[in-house]
C-alpha cells in the first residue's frame, strides 16, 4: 500500500510524522508527505480566493490518479470515527490525500475526489498532517487487527 499526503504548504512537521511513517511500514504501507507551494500560489493568495483555489487545483491535478483512491480533506465533508476511516481506506493499494491552502478547494477539484473531514474544528496544516498520519496508522491497525487501536 502507498499513502501520499499532498498539501499546499512550505514544510512538514517532520519529527512526529516520521514516527507514523516508520510505524506504517510494519503494515507494508509507505506513507509519504509532499509539500507543494508553487510561486503562483503565493501571488494568487494575495489576489483572490478564486485565484488561490485555482492555483491549488493546478498544483494538485498532476497527482490525481484515476487508479488510486483520491481523498480531499474538506471541513464540510463527510466525517466519521476511526473505524469509518479505516473502511474507506481498506482494499486500496494507492491512496492520495490532498490538503488545500487557506482558501480550500475549487468545487471542480472536489468532483474528482472523495471528500473527508477530520473534525469540525479548523487545524493548521501542521496539525492536520499529524492528525491525518496518526489516523492512517490507526486505520491500518484496525484493518490488520493490531492492538494499537483498542
UniProtKB/Swiss-Prot annotation:
Catalytic activities: pseudouridine(1915) in 23S rRNA + S-adenosyl-L-methionine = N(3)-methylpseudouridine(1915) in 23S rRNA + S-adenosyl-L-homocysteine + H(+)
Keyword Secreted among record annotations: no
GO cellular component: cytoplasm
Protein location: Cytoplasm
Keyword entries, A-Z: Cytoplasm, Methyltransferase, rRNA processing, S-adenosyl-L-methionine, Transferase
Annotated family: Belongs to the RNA methyltransferase RlmH family.
Keyword Methyltransferase: yes
Function: Specifically methylates the pseudouridine at position 1915 (m3Psi1915) in 23S rRNA.
Quaternary assembly: Homodimer.
Single GO MF descriptor: rRNA (pseudouridine-N3-)-methyltransferase activity
NCBIfam families, alphabetized: PRK00103.2-1
Record: residues binding S-adenosyl-L-methionine: 100, 118-123
Protein name, per record: Ribosomal RNA large subunit methyltransferase H
InterPro entries in alphabetical order: Alpha/beta_knot_MTases, RlmH-like, tRNA_m1G_MTases_N
EC class name: transferase
EC number(s) from the headed UniProt entry: 2.1.1.177
